[in-house]
């Protein structure tokens, strides 16, 4: 199938609107991607004609809703090449998935004197849960430092592991720098030291194929809303043997086998024992539609288009005076920058006046901001629906801001 950005854009209603009297150039998909009509319609159709509470219902609507939900679990397992659909837990998003691992597996396996390794480029969602776990149990948090070019100082990694290392928690792709980490090398090293590996895939799964079996990671987590799906839904993958050993971290309906006031409670099997309460079934249906949509386009086709667009953007941005770019030349999805000494918020506000949506701030990565000694950065994201013309508008806008502000 030949990739056509014009055909893709036609599927996204919001891309036809104007902002401040100008066509919208949406360069903020790393924060949250827009939704195609196929996703919007699938979720709306479920609520119009198919909604019911899932699990245990004997009536037709409930049985059909349950089947649809479990079919999405199967589709998601194929999307990341898991061995079994029962290795996937529905979560609210990447943040909840990481917290689930920290509170279930972490509480059961990390003890005083143990250590967990993260990196200096992590999103707060892959820092704070581990800080909280370490504080609870008396463990140590170790950090892989950054290089100025936005890559990790991987030569330091072997020195961080020891017999007390329980986990390496690492981002697949940096949400600020676009750096893609060499996961196979890092995961192999971690396993040689007897440590498990959690991968934050929130910024990876929309850009190219992900194969959790080839990676051999123990945990992989991502969000639906960055993958052109709904908010409030994501996937946590856990190797089956690990998942079966993990205790539930939330209690309630749907995750129990039996409940007795005198004899206590027993749990249902994984993954359902990690899905307490009424699930976000509509969001799950929408996620399934998003997975179907990107799979039909072909992730390899998407990757080729986006990489060509990224190379074009980086070359064109060289013409902007006083522009500082952060991150390596080879990157995925995002371009972080500052313009002269102007605050990122000011630059972002000017761009918004030109109909260009970028993200400004610390991007939930304060340790990374501290490393570069800046309070904030602008970040332009490039997704499969962005165009060369939108890149040109960004470049022209930045040149104009430089002339105005000096």
UniProtKB/Swiss-Prot annotation:
What cofactors are annotated for this protein?
Answer: pyridoxal 5'-phosphate
- Identify the SUPFAM superfamilies for this entry: PLP-dependent transferases (SSF53383)
Any idea which UniProt keywords this protein has?
A: Cytoplasm, Lyase, Pyridoxal phosphate, Transferase
Where is the protein localized? Cytoplasm
Which NCBIfam families does its entry note?
Answer: PRK09295.1, sufS
Q: What family does this chain come from, according to its entry?
A: Belongs to the class-V pyridoxal-phosphate-dependent aminotransferase family. Csd subfamily.
Instruction: Return the protein name.
Output: Cysteine desulfurase
Q: Gene symbol?
A: sufS
């Amino acid at each position: 199938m030949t990739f056509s950005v014009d055909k893709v854009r036609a599927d996204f209603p919001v891309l036809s609107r104007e902002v401040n009297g100008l066509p919208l150039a949406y360069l903020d998909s790393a924060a949250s991607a827009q939704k195609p009509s196929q996703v919007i319609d699938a979720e709306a159709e479920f609520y119009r004609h198919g909604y019911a509470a899932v699990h245990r219902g004997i009536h037709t609507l409930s049985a059909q809703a349950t089947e649809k939900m479990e079919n999405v679990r199967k589709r998601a397992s194929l999307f990341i090449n898991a061995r079994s659909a029962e290795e996937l837990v529905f979560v609210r998003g990447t943040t909840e998935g990481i917290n689930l691992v920290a509170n279930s597996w972490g509480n059961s396996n990390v003890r005083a004197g143990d250590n967990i390794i993260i990196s200096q480029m992590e999103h707060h969602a892959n820092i704070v849960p581990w800080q909280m776990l370490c504080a609870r149990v008396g463990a140590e948090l170790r950090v892989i430092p950054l290089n100025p070019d936005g890559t990790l100082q991987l030569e330091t990694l072997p020195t961080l592991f020891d017999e007390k290392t329980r986990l390496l928690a690492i981002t697949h792709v940096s949400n600020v720098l676009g750096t893609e980490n060499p996961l196979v090398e890092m995961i192999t090293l971690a396993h040689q030291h007897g440590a498990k590996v959690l991968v934050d895939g929130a910024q990876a799964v929309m850009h190219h194929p992900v194969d959790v079996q080839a990676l051999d990671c123990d945990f992989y987590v991502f969000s639906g809303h960055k993958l052109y799906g709904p908010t409030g839904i994501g996937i946590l993958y856990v190797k089956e043997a690990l998942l079966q050993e993990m205790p539930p971290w939330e209690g309630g309906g749907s995750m129990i086998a039996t409940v007795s006031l005198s004899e206590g409670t027993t749990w249902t099997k994984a993954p359902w024992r990690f899905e307490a309460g009424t699930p976000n079934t509509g969001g799950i249906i929408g996620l399934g539609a998003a997975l179907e949509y990107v799979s039909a386009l072909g992730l390899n086709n998407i990757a080729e288009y986006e990489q060509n667009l990224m190379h074009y953007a980086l070359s064109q941005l060289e013409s902007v005076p006083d522009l500082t770019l952060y991150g390596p030349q080879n990157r995925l999805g995002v371009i972080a920058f500052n313009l002269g000494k102007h605050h990122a918020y000011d630059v972002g506000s000017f761009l918004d006046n030109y109909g260009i949506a970028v993200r400004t701030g610390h991007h939930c990565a304060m340790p990374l901001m501290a490393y570069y000694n800046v309070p904030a950065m602008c970040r332009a994201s490039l997704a499969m629906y962005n165009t060369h013309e939108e890149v040109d508008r960004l470049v022209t806008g930045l040149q104009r801001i430089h002339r105005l502000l000096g």
